[in-house]
From Swiss-Prot:
It is an enzyme of class 2 (transferase). Homodimer. Keywords: Amino-acid biosynthesis, Aminotransferase, Histidine biosynthesis, Pyridoxal phosphate, Transferase. Its cofactor is pyridoxal 5'-phosphate. The gene is hisC. This is Histidinol-phosphate aminotransferase. GO terms for biological process: L-histidine biosynthetic process. It comes from the Bacteria.
Length: 372
């Protein structure tokens, strides 16, 4: 047991928190960071200027509490999402993790179950634990896919009260077809399950990929969560949001902290939404780099998964940790997600992507046994 865990063990922690470690990817000082799926292109200059101006204006009123209902921001988010959504359908918080936490606070808790399908976003079980919600680990196919029949059966078998569907899935990058969402929703009727479709990376999906937003009408237990951390390059600003039936957003108001969304955060998000053309242009370039990575990994004899995100999950590695370390030694940090034979890399700028591909190929050429 580590010293940190020993110190924690001396405190009167809740039982379900004992032995746990805080969530977090390695934060290392290396030239090329491709490990946490950030938008590697940064904030364009004109968007920076708009944010600076908006925050300066907000600063003049920082002695007052912010708009508790963040009305203007909800209007802008509804307009951005489209699909006939109104501000009453929108909720936002400090990152999509806080949105998910608020959903669990409202609909989870002692005696209730949340179902996820690993490998998937590693925060789901931590959020469940933090709200005393039992986390049930479902199963995927051998290729990490999830089909409608299997997913629906697992919802019925577990009697889950909350279901997490990550699309595109993290860490695999693969999207879910909407028939899976529909089947899961119908299967959750008996337990009145809240179905969350986590679309944090949806803007990076291939053209004409449908969103679960199209399924919201008539489905009051369906929630679609999004974030401005990825496509909008605002990971440092912390703004996540969701779309759902108005009664669901009203339920979230029961558990939110007062004035939870600062005036600075609201101003930043609004400025980015109002100047999103440049940001979406960067998204298109990131998609080009992602597809380039897939093509090059295939050429190297590796096994990349089809990706609708800003990262690529790839297998075919006998010793992924050694490859990870070799890349780190070359100044490139990617993610070892703990899945045998696999690693995950964020699509970088063109020079960053080139550096990753060249370093990886050099490692593979010099250490052939690492290829399975």
């Amino acid at each position: 047991m580590s010293d940190q865990l020993e110190r924690l063990d001396r405190l009167p922690l809740r039982t379900n928190l004992r032995g746990l470690s805080p969530y977090g990817a390695p934060q290392l000082d290396v030239p090329i960071l491709l490990n946490v799926n950030e938008n590697t292109h940064g904030v364009p200059a004109d968007v920076q200027a708009a944010i600076t101006e908006a925050v300066a204006a907000a600063a003049t009123g920082l002695n007052r509490y912010p708009d508790r209902e963040f009305t203007e921001l909800r209007e802008a988010l509804a307009e951005y999402l489209g699909h006939g959504l109104s501000p009453d359908n929108i909720w936002a918080a400090n990152g999509s993790n806080e949105v998910l936490q608020q959903i669990l606070q409202a609909f989870g808790g002692p005696g209730r179950k949340a179902l996820g399908f690993p490998p998937t976003y590693s925060m789901y079980p931590l959020l469940a634990s933090g709200t005393d919600t039992e986390y049930v680990r479902g199963v995927r196919a051998d290729d990490y896919g999830l089909d409608a029949q299997s997913a629906a059966a697992q919802v019925r078998e577990t009697g889950a009260n909350i279901v997490f569907l990550c699309s595109p899935n993290n860490p695999t990058g693969t999207g879910l077809s909407l028939d899976v969402v529909e089947a899961v929703y119908e299967a959750g009727e008996a337990s009145q399950a809240i179905v969350i479709v986590d679309e944090a990376y949806h803007e990076f999906a291939h053209d004409n990929t449908p969103s679960a937003l199209t399924l919201l009408p008539g489905r009051e237990r369906l929630i679609v969560s999004r974030t401005m951390s990825k496509a909008f390059a605002l990971a440092g600003a912390r703004l996540g949001y969701m779309a759902a039936a108005p009664e669901v957003t009203d339920a979230i108001r029961l558990v939110r902290l007062p004035y939870h969304l600062s005036a600075v955060t609201q101003a930043t998000a609004l400025a980015a939404l109002n100047h999103r053309e440049a940001l979406m242009a960067d998204v298109e370039d990131i998609k080009v780099q992602r597809d380039r990575i897939v093509t090059e990994l295939l050429r190297m004899g590796l096994k990349p998964a089809a990706s609708d995100s800003n990262y690529v999950f790839f297998g075919g590695l006998e010793d992924p940790h050694t490859i990870w370390q070799g890349l780190l030694d070359a100044g490139v940090l990617i993610r070892d997600v703990g899945i045998p034979g696999h690693l995950r890399v964020t699509a970088g700028t063109e020079p960053e992507t080139t550096a990753f591909l060249e370093a990886l190929e050099a490692l593979l050429d010099g250490t052939a046994p690492h290829r399975a």
